[in-house]
Design a protein with these regions (language model features):
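Conserved "landmark" site that anchors the functional core of diverse proteins
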Residues: 1-345
Length: 345
């Protein structure tokens, strides 16, 4: 066995996987990765199951050192500078650390969370089928708390497999999509329109439990207390001060504030990766559209292995080029015989 040692790491970093399912009836929240697509991409790069336990790294930097043998890892998620012994490591790629080598990750340059997957996955004692850490509840393994310098993982020795990159689809842009409710009837039409028509920013005081939204105060129709009922990842509740809170992975399993809307499953990761202070909007969609989008999201996760490429091959994102009309320029702007410009971009 090799070891991967945490040499340094910032706050808001912990072991996360696909989450703890089937235990909410006991008051145990799901927890798990804030951005499931990035978790799955990193795991796919090193041959793990998509939602295997990995390191969720918060906005600040981190360094990891291989000991007692080589360790193969991969990174995906919020972009940041990364290198091994001064050699750059691209996002969405795998890399093998030789014994004694250190992977250095800088501050996130957009988004919040980056995922470090380890070939063979992190091992520990399952709690209701998951290693996911919920620091408030003291749940998770092997460290039921945020990671700190000196922590280490016993991992499988690197397989020697060739390094890979993964071609992810162009990120979705535009408003975060929500389904109104389940208590949207606790708000009049004017305040629902205010919620959907306003720009919002995520407060710097947000965490894995909830994202506090900065913007106009939303007024209740009948008061801010309801009989406590169940919550889900992405529930947007409005407390008495009128400032909405989007409930995230470490949320409580029930709550007593009206929920004006619910972020669709396919967009929860997008919201999670929205940096504090970045302006964004919400857009209401139908339940049918939300269900269609989650089916597409599940299909994307299943098909991630089809997006793997050799790390030595040239990365050419045709989807992005097409959207930017760059691919059309490359095809139509030159005469094949003379290599003279024949069309404007």
């Amino acid at each position: 066995m090799s070891r991967l040692v945490v040499a340094s790491i910032g706050p808001a970093s912990s072991v996360q996987d696909g989450g703890r399912h089937g235990a909410q009836r006991y008051g145990l929240t799901v927890s798990g990765a804030m951005d499931r697509l990035s978790l799955a991409a990193a795991n796919t790069l090193v041959g793990n199951e998509p939602f295997a336990a990995s390191v969720e790294i918060g906005p600040f930097g981190a360094t990891f050192t291989a000991r007692d043998g080589a360790v193969r890892v991969a990174i995906s998620g919020a972009p940041r500078n990364a290198d091994v012994a001064g050699n750059p490591v691209a996002m969405d790629t795998s890399v093998t650390l030789k014994d004694g080598e250190t992977l250095t990750l800088g501050f996130a340059r957009g988004g919040a969370f980056t995922y470090l997957a380890i070939e063979g996955a992190i091992k520990g004692e399952m709690v209701f089928g998951s290693l996911a850490v919920n620091a408030r509840a003291g749940l998770g393994s092997p460290y039921p708390r945020p990671l700190q310098a000196g922590d280490e993982f016993s991992v499988d020795a690197a397989s020697g497999a060739g390094e890979l990159r993964i071609e992810l689809p162009k990120p979705i842009s535009g408003p975060i999509r929500v389904v109104l409710g389940p208590q949207d009837d606790e708000f009049d039409d004017a305040n629902k329109a205010l919620f959907l028509g306003s720009e919002w920013k995520i407060s710097a005081t947000s965490d894995r439990m909830g994202y506090r939204l900065e913007g106009p105060a939303i007024k209740h129709l009948h008061g801010h207390n309801i009989v406590s009922d169940g919550t889900v990842n992405g529930s947007i509740q409005v407390p008495g001060n009128g400032s909405p809170i989007a409930l995230m992975m470490d949320r409580g399993t029930s709550g007593g504030y009206p929920k004006i809307a619910t972020v669709i499953t396919a967009d929860v990761g997008r919201l999670a990766q929205t940096s504090a202070g970045t302006a964004f909007r919400f857009r209401a969609v139908s339940m049918a559209e939300a269900q269609d989008e989650v089916r597409k999201f599940a299909q994307l996760i299943r098909n991630l292995p089809d997006r793997l490429r050799s790390a030595d091959s040239v990365a050419l994102n045709i989807e992005a080029l097409s959207d930017a009309n760059v691919a059309g320029y490359a095809v139509s702007a030159m005469d094949a015989g003379t290599w003279q410009v024949t069309a404007e971009p």
